[in-house]
Design a protein with these regions (language model features):
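N-terminal amphipathic/basic-hydrophobic helices that include classical n-h-c signal peptides
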Residues: 1-15
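Hydrophobic N-terminal alpha-helices or hydrophobic patches in metabolic proteins across all domains
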Residues: 16-129
Length: 129
């Protein structure tokens, strides 16, 4: 029996974006932090337990710049240069996130999930390495 799967353009675009995001793994990136550690989300009111920002000049599946969580920096920062160690691929959303860390820092998948749970608990996701 042969199974044929049809993928509509939207799903293909999401898969393609996800594959492109894997290009960042292991690379050093300059990021801009627009939601500093301890700041309050303007719409939903939760507090950011980590610095959260984006990679300038990129585009994610939601049409905005590619978002990222900055782990291991325990003070609010405006910009940062760090290494991408993982991609948070949202299965039920178009908005993947990068995991950025300071040099020589490593986090297990369990540790990453614990640190990003404040926001990712609303989405099905996998950690891609």
């Amino acid at each position: 029996m042969v199974r044929v799967y049809f993928i509509n353009n939207n799903v293909f675009k999401r898969m393609k974006n996800h594959m492109n995001h894997k290009e960042y793994l292991g690379k050093e990136l300059n990021i801009v932090i627009d939601r500093e550690l301890g700041s309050k989300h303007p719409e939903y009111g939760f507090i950011y337990p980590v610095n959260y920002g984006y990679v300038p000049g990129t585009i994610s599946g939601d049409g905005e710049e590619l978002d990222c969580y900055l782990l291991g920096v325990f003070e609010p920062v405006k910009t940062f240069k760090g290494k991408c160690i993982a991609v948070v691929h949202r299965i039920n959303d178009d908005d993947d996130k990068l995991i950025i860390v300071a040099e020589n820092k490593e986090y297990s998948d369990d540790a990453i999930n614990a640190l990003i749970e404040f926001q990712e608990r609303y989405f099905e996701h996998v950690i891609v390495r």
